[in-house]
Amino acid sequence: MTQAEIKLCSLLLQEHFGEIVEKIGVHLIRTGSQPLRVIAHDTKASLDQVKKALCVLIHHNLVIYHVHKRGVVEYEAQCSRVLRMLRYPRYIYTTKTLYGDTGELIVEELLLNGKMTMSAVVKKVADRLTETMEDGKTMDYAEVSNAFVRLADTHFVQRCPLVPDTDSSDPGPPPPAPNLVINEKDMYLVPKLSLIGKGKRRRSSDEDAAGEPKAKKPRCTDNEEPTPDDGIYWQVNLDRFHQHFRDQAIVSAVANRMDQTSSEIVRTMLRMSEITTPSGAPFTQPLSSNEIFRSLPVGYNISKQVLDQYLTLLADDPLEFIGKAGDSGGGMYVINLHKALASLSTATLESVIQERFGSRCARIFRLVLQKKHLEQKQVEDFAMIPAKEAKDMLYKMLSENFISLQEIPKTPDHAPSRTFYLYTVNVLSAARMLLHRCYKSIANLIERRQFETKENKRLLEKSQRVEAIMASMQATGAEEVQLQEIEEMITAPERQQLETLKRNVNKLDASEIQVDETIFLLESYIESTMKRQ
């Protein structure tokens, strides 16, 4: 766990949950697993605060617990899961593009609340969608339920592990913490709910003022019927989203390298194997040419012969994204996911080198990568770059850890005159170094955004107050002159300052998302490589 990762986790926890949760979370990230009382002692927080903070972190899957043989419960932070909070906007946007506004709000609610029952999600989303609709229109619960079922069928949401049913006749004491389990076949099983109803609008403030005083909310009594899915909680399946992001990156890479038809064939193959292939598998399941032809999108008019030519072309490509696994069924083909991730990571490294050091350094990097091991003289000759410039460029990349130097001595004394000095590229090491820098970059972006917001806090508060007054006056049917007077409460220089702030914050937000795309590619490649070793 690097300092850059810990700092980024700290910023994310503080932004999402506040100071107390951040304090407990970062303490667990630094120290590893600890029991409750040790956490309270080390952080100087009250036992009640620690319990509440752990409850929040466990509910959002950011902390897990283990029960030891002696019955001691220890809590452990999931740093990698904390870092996934960076990707929340991307998860939500992806769901919007695939399943529309309803799917977007379902995933948003699950991410914001950690875990929820299906009935609670459906009601909340229906209410939110009804709020945005025109007067007189409402969102039906059944429509939201159908969107939820589609998300579960494609594994974007999954059930949370449950407390197993205990035998009431068992005389032994209950365990200090429940051991949650779930059967794999039940993970995407949607409970049969007959949710009948429509979304409700919140009463506006003027209605409350004109009408009767608000009735007190009735307390839940024991006689109140529980919902049919009571105790069945759902969460977002982040691995499935990562699988989708990886597939999109591969399709985009094939489109850039070859053409749109090739990318559509690869997209079809990935879509056919997305449920059957585990998220960390190095290859997809073998697919026959006939199966691929039958599964091509409707209206995509290419003949079987043309498809076979494309598949042969893809299989013969030096990048080896597609491999041939047999000749049955017109030819069996697989997508080499590990090779694809390695190529995407290498392309990312090349792009970074070109941006930082120029095209000549990128040429040397590609050359060393292709030839595996090269002496300085060979680099000069192959790259056709003068000796002095080549030496400077190699040193720059060596000092930044993009390339490494390997010594091969001719004699045991390692004398420089009798030693070969070979330049080589360790892609895994370079990817780790770049990933570390990406974490630093995102932490800097978050800090900058927080600074910009803090500097203009008073102006933002004033703007929000003016907007609230405008909204309430428009609702009561105020005249145009009155509205204009309220608008003029914010002066022209203040309005310009607000525009600049908005533009800067939008740039910083966009930069965060773009850096996270690089983080995703590098993390996927490192994870895939570690599984193969």
UniProtKB/Swiss-Prot annotation:
GO terms for cellular component: nucleoplasm; RNA polymerase III complex. Residues 211-222 have a biased composition (Basic and acidic residues). Signal peptide: none annotated. Coiled coil: none annotated. The keyword Kinase does not apply. This is DNA-directed RNA polymerase III subunit RPC3. DNA-dependent RNA polymerase catalyzes the transcription of DNA into RNA using the four ribonucleoside triphosphates as substrates. Specific peripheric component of RNA polymerase III (Pol III) which synthesizes small non-coding RNAs including 5S rRNA, snRNAs, tRNAs and miRNAs from at least 500 distinct genomic loci. Part of POLR3C/RPC3-POLR3F/RPC6-POLR3G/RPC7 heterotrimer, coordinates the dynamics of Pol III stalk and clamp modules during the transition from apo to elongation state. Pol III plays a key role in sensing and limiting infection by intracellular bacteria and DNA viruses. The keyword Cytoplasm does not apply. One of its GO terms (molecular function) is single-stranded DNA binding. Keywords: Antiviral defense, DNA-binding, DNA-directed RNA polymerase, Immunity, Innate immunity, Nucleus, Phosphoprotein, Transcription. Belongs to the eukaryotic RPC3/POLR3C RNA polymerase subunit family. The gene is Polr3c. Transmembrane segments: none annotated. Component of the RNA polymerase III complex consisting of 17 subunits: a ten-subunit horseshoe-shaped catalytic core composed of POLR3A/RPC1, POLR3B/RPC2, POLR1C/RPAC1, POLR1D/RPAC2, POLR3K/RPC10, POLR2E/RPABC1, POLR2F/RPABC2, POLR2H/RPABC3, POLR2K/RPABC4 and POLR2L/RPABC5; a mobile stalk composed of two subunits POLR3H/RPC8 and CRCP/RPC9, protruding from the core and functioning primarily in transcription initiation; and additional subunits homologous to general transcription factors of the RNA polymerase II machinery, POLR3C/RPC3-POLR3F/RPC6-POLR3G/RPC7 heterotrimer required for transcription initiation and POLR3D/RPC4-POLR3E/RPC5 heterodimer involved in both transcription initiation and termination. The modification Phosphoserine is found at S194. Residues 161-183, 197-228 are annotated as: Disordered. It comes from the Eukaryota. InterPro entries: POLR3C_WHD, RNA_pol_III_RPC82-rel_HTH, RNA_pol_III_Rpc82_C, RPC3, WH-like_DNA-bd_sf. It is found in: Nucleus. It holds the Pfam family RNA_pol_Rpc82. It comes from Rattus norvegicus. GO terms for biological process: defense response to virus; DNA-templated transcription; innate immune response; positive regulation of innate immune response; positive regulation of interferon-beta production.
